[in-house]
Each structure stands twice: as C-alpha cells, then as structure tokens.
Amino acid sequence: MENLARFLSTTLKQLRQQRGWSLSRLAEATGVSKAMLGQIERNESSPTVATLWKIATGLNVPFSTFISPPQSATPSVYDPQQQAMVITSLFPYDPQLCFEHFSIQMASGAISESTPHEKGVIEHVVVIDGQLDLCVDGEWQTLNCGEGVRFAADVTHIYRNGGEQTVHFHSLIHYPRS
C-alpha cells in the first residue's frame, strides 16, 4: 500500500509538471484544494476515491493512471476515509481500446459519489455478488447479482451498498477516442 501511495504522489506531480501547471492551476482544473494537492504530492495525505476521480477528470487522464504501477499485477485503492471500498484494476487503461476495467468491493453501508467524467465516457456496471444501489443523474436503481447497466458517465453517479453484506461489482469505463 505504501508503494501505491508513493506511486500516486509521484504520478500526480509528474502530470502537473508535464503540463507546466502550478498547484493553483491544478486546483482550478480539479476542484481539489491546493493544500490537499500539495499534501498528496508530498505523500503526506491519501486521497479518497472521490478525490482521486476529481483529479483524474481534471487532468483528463484515466483513473487507473494513478493506481497501476507498471510492475504491479493487481493494484488496489483502499478508501481510507470510508474504510469500506476497495478498487482493483483488472485491466489498466488501454489507449488503443480506450477503456479500463475495475473490480470494486464495498462494505455494507458504504457510499461513493463519482463526479461527472468527461463528455462521451460510458460506464458499464455488473454486480458479481450482493446488491448495489446506483444513482445516475438523480435516478436510483437497484442491481442484484448478475445484473448490469450501461450509462453515460458524464453526469454525477453514486454507488451505495444498502445491503447487509459486501457488494462486489465490476466497472468497465470506455473513454471517447481523442
């Protein structure tokens, strides 16, 4: 987990510097405070999954950019604030196919709000085990084991486990071609 945190902080700093951006400019683009971004870059703070999505969206890079070190076969992100969500990259972003694929586990009672992705992003969610409540653009639906949905992910979407057991689901995210 420590290697992942170091990888995340290094990657964030490299992406910011490649663009020639200050922390203030990065804060404007992501909606994350300059102080928090600085703490993440210095590896003094671990971002929540929601914060990491904001950063990825603001930088216009796939989420897996931050959790897929080249030498790691199964990188995971654990949400330290919720202490209830684990995201594992099954297939990191593929620039030729323009998608990434995650396995996600959420403990009972966990909730995660995802900010809108860039225009044209499509997300597929399939429940592997348990029951998932999903809200897309204000409309809630419940998905049971074996059920799935595809939606435009350029709107706010919320994942919630209202059940008594951990829910396990896959998220396949398609990005528009550049």
Swiss-Prot record:
Any one Gene Ontology molecular-function term assigned to this protein's record: DNA binding
* Species, as recorded: Escherichia coli (strain K12)
Claim: Repressor is one of the keywords in the record: yes
Q: Where is the Cupin type-2 domain?
A: 105-171
Outline the extent of the HTH cro/C1-type domain. Answer: 12-66
- Which Pfam families does the record match to this protein? Cupin_2, HTH_3
Instruction: Supply the PANTHER family for this chain.
Output: HTH-TYPE TRANSCRIPTIONAL REGULATOR, HTH-TYPE TRANSCRIPTIONAL REGULATOR SUTR
Q: What does this protein do?
A: Regulates the expression of 12-16 transcription units involved in various steps of sulfur utilization. Represses expression of pfkB, fliZ, cysE, ydcO and its own expression. Activates expression of ypfN. Acts by binding to SutR boxes.
Gene name, Swiss-Prot/TrEMBL:
sutR
Tell me, using the record's free text, what induces this protein: Negatively autoregulated.
Database matches in InterPro entries: Bact_TransReg_Diox, Cro/C1-type_HTH, Cupin_2, Lambda_DNA-bd_dom_sf, RmlC-like_jellyroll, RmlC_Cupin_sf
Q: Does the keyword field hold DNA-binding?
A: yes
Protein name as it appears in the record = HTH-type transcriptional regulator SutR
**Keyword list, A-Z:** Activator, DNA-binding, Repressor, Transcription, Transcription regulation
Which residues form the DNA-binding region?
23-42
GO biological process, any: negative regulation of DNA-templated transcription
